[in-house]
């Protein structure tokens, strides 16, 4: 029978790591998770996340609307200049110039909420990773029979994987908001006479506000679901075959 020889000193280090991780995880489940559920539930009840009139979220766009007559004259002068000037390099430099307005800031109300949300996303992903590792360390040696507890472990692991995928997507979702808003602001600055582009900026802010509230709810629910399912099945997760088994080697 093939066996893997492990130095006692190396095994002792692994055992210390495992015991430390198990202690941390059980402390998380016993106190930290209930605390986070309560904190996030309180966050969801704050006025900042319960704005009934979303038009109050509107951020000022310091993009002046041009005078149509002056714009027409400017356009005619530009056409004349392009005919006279055949220097492609100069034309390229002109095209790279920014819009004729000052800097357009982010939506401060949305930014404040995101500054509170992002640490929560980071925290829940780290805690989920810790609990997932704990669960994997409880998996017994693969053998026939008495595998009901192992099946429970697999179901809980599937749930954790699904939660991790969803939570990881929040970072991409936030980045996408800034990218899309930046594009909308750029279009509004380049074509200030088109009201739809201005409105698009406000629509993106409102959509992100709703998404922020949903993300806070999802994080709270992730803590609650993990706490509940592990608490209900703790014995099966800890001792899937009714006794402590070693790690898979």
Swiss-Prot record:
A GO-annotated cellular component: nucleoplasm
Stretch list, region Disordered: 60-101
A Pfam family this chain is assigned to: PA28_N
GO terms for MF: endopeptidase activator activity
Record GO biological process: regulation of G1/S transition of mitotic cell cycle; regulation of proteasomal protein catabolic process
Domain of life: Eukaryota
Composition skew (Basic and acidic residues), residue ranges: 68-98
The keyword Lipid metabolism is assigned to this record: no
Gene3D superfamilies in UniProt: Proteasome activator pa28, C-terminal domain, Proteasome activator pa28, N-terminal domain
InterPro entries xref list: PA28_C, PA28_C_sf, PA28_N_sf, Proteasome_activ_PA28, Proteasome_activ_PA28_N, Proteasome_activ_sf
Induction profile: By interferon gamma.
Key words of the record: Proteasome
Subunit structure, as described in the record: Heterodimer of PSME1 and PSME2, which forms a hexameric ring. PSME1 can form homoheptamers.
Function statement: Implicated in immunoproteasome assembly and required for efficient antigen processing. The PA28 activator complex enhances the generation of class I binding peptides by altering the cleavage pattern of the proteasome.
Protein family according to the UniProt entry: Belongs to the PA28 family.
PANTHER family the record matches: PROTEASOME ACTIVATOR COMPLEX SUBUNIT 1 (PTHR10660:SF5), PROTEASOME REGULATOR PA28 (PTHR10660)
Protein name: Proteasome activator complex subunit 1
Organism: Macaca fascicularis
Organism ancestry: Eukaryota, Metazoa, Chordata, Craniata, Vertebrata
């Amino acid at each position: 029978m093939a066996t893997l020889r492990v130095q006692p000193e190396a095994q002792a280090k692994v055992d210390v790591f495992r015991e430390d991780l198990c202690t941390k995880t059980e402390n998380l489940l016993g106190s930290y998770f209930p605390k986070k559920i309560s904190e996030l539930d309180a966050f969801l009840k704050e006025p900042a996340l319960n704005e009934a009139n979303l038009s109050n979220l509107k951020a000022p766009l310091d993009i002046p609307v041009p005078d149509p007559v002056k714009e027409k004259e400017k356009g005619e002068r530009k056409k004349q200049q392009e005919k006279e000037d055949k220097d492609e390099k100069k034309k390229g430099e002109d095209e790279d110039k920014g819009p004729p307005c000052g800097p357009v800031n982010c939506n401060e109300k949305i930014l404040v909420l995101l500054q509170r949300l992002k640490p929560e996303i980071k925290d829940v992903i780290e805690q989920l990773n810790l609990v997932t590792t704990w669960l994997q360390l409880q998996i017994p040696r693969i053998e026939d029979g008495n595998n009901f507890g192992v099946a429970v472990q697999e179901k809980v692991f599937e749930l954790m994987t699904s939660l991790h995928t969803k939570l990881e997507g929040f970072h991409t979702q936030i980045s996408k908001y800034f990218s899309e808003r930046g594009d909308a602001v750029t279009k509004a600055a380049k074509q200030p006479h088109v009201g739809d582009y201005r409105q698009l900026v406000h629509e993106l802010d409102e959509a992100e506000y709703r998404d922020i509230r949903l993300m806070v709810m999802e994080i709270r629910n992730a803590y609650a679901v993990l706490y509940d399912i592990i608490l209900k099945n703790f014995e099966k997760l800890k001792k899937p075959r009714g006794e402590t088994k070693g790690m898979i080697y």
